[in-house]
């Protein structure tokens, strides 16, 4: 489901004013959220943000202090977990070690007293879906981590839930396998057409898999949007710093026009100019966020640089990360700015020797890249 489709559709899951307290502490603080059918929706936040507590309330494992959970028009707030058309796949997978793969998948169906012929057909269907048919007779300990993840997914989908909850679904896998499995999991969920809500602290996982992301902190929603929205258009300093890397400058608006604005930033000798006007008057305080990948790096000062959007500094650190490098540039006032340079960057510019430690360099950025963040 695209963001455009979601915005015009009727919400499939409605979370209305949900609150959960432990003592005097709000684990979830008045959450309102609409999730649409066939979405893969990510709850993203650091430890203690409230994302897992929210997931547990959706599953029925925690009872809210107030608020409602409406699924497909039905109020399920007070339903027991086993009465909800919701299944959860945990990070540990929770496979029964004494059962075979096919027995694990069939377990929930047997609990529901489904006829044996239908169980066998459903198990076979799930095994084909996750491409694990030839492993049907194996026990969990005879499978790799990635294979166990597939079986846990198949078992979760076997009952055809209206909502599938994923609790750190790939957290038990190593990084390389996790990256490979992300797209496999998305493909499987899209084939089935199930609405999915996943909890993760892994930004890359959320950005890769989710249709939309809700960023949580201190039990509250900080921003909800598509992966590109929350990365390119953060609505607060918290979101800008939480998603990816960024350079944050304290600033004050000194010019504000219909089609551009000029901001004086602490630590930058030259002002920052952006290609659009800002709401509100001049002289308002704000922050300016500039992503490292949006900052160009030069050994010599380009002739076209004018009065805005550039600075001079010294290379203090270089982190080589294969396909790109992160340069830490120390400015005259001691402020350090990060610039992310792709591997072919210097080759394209016919520069044989890239800048190195303690070398003077120049950085610049286009007018459309700085993001103003109001206080």
Please give the residue ranges for each predicted region.
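ABC ATPase nucleotide-binding domains
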Residues: 40, 81-241
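The feature captures the beta-strand-to-loop junction immediately N-terminal to the Walker
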Residues: 44-46
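Helix-to-loop junction immediately C-terminal to a conserved catalytic motif
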Residues: 59
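Conserved coupling/switch loops of ABC nucleotide-binding domains, chiefly the family-specific signature
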Residues: 65-68, 118, 218, 250
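Conserved ABC transporter NBD signature motif
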Residues: 67-75
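Non-catalytic connector elements of ABC transporters
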Residues: 246, 256-375
């Amino acid at each position: 489901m695209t963001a455009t489709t979601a915005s015009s559709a009727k919400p499939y899951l409605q979370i209305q004013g949900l609150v959960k307290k432990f003592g005097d502490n709000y684990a979830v603080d008045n959450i309102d959220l609409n999730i649409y059918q066939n979405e893969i929706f990510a709850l993203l936040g650091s430890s203690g943000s409230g994302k897992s507590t929210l997931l547990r309330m959706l599953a029925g494992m925690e009872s809210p202090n107030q608020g409602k959970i409406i699924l497909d028009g039905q109020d399920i707030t007070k339903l027991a977990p086993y009465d909800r058309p919701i299944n959860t796949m945990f990070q540990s997978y929770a496979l029964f070690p004494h059962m075979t793969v096919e027995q694990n998948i069939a377990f929930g169906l047997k609990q529901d007293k489904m006829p044996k012929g239908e169980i066998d057909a459903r198990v076979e269907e799930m095994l084909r879906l996750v491409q694990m048919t030839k492993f049907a007779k194996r026990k969990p300990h005879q499978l790799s981590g990635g294979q166990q993840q597939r079986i846990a997914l198949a078992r979760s989908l076997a009952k055809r839930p209206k909502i599938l909850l994923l609790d750190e679904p790939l957290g038990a896998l190593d990084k390389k396998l996790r990256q490979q499995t992300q797209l496999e999991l998305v493909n499987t969920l899209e084939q089935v057409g199930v609405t999915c809500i996943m909890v993760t602290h892994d930004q890359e996982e959320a950005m890769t898999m989710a249709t939309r992301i809700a960023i949580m902190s201190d039990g509250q929603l900080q921003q909800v949007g598509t992966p590109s929205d929350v990365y390119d258009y953060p609505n607060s300093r918290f979101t800008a710093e939480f998603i990816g890397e960024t350079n944050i400058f304290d600033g004050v608006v000194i010019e504000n026009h219909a089609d551009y604005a000029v901001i004086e930033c602490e630590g930058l000798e030259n002002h920052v100019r952006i290609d659009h006007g800002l709401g509100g008057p001049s002289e308002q305080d704000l922050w300016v966020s500039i992503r490292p990948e949006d900052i160009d790096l030069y050994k010599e000062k380009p002739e076209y640089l004018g009065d805005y959007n550039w600075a001079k500094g010294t290379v203090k650190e270089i982190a080589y990360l294969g396909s790109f490098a992160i340069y830490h540039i120390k400015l005259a006032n001691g402020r350090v700015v990060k610039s992310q340079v792709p591997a072919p960057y210097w080759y394209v510019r016919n520069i044989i020797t890239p800048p190195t430690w303690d070398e003077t360099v120049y950085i610049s950025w286009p007018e459309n890249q700085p993001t103003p963040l109001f206080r």
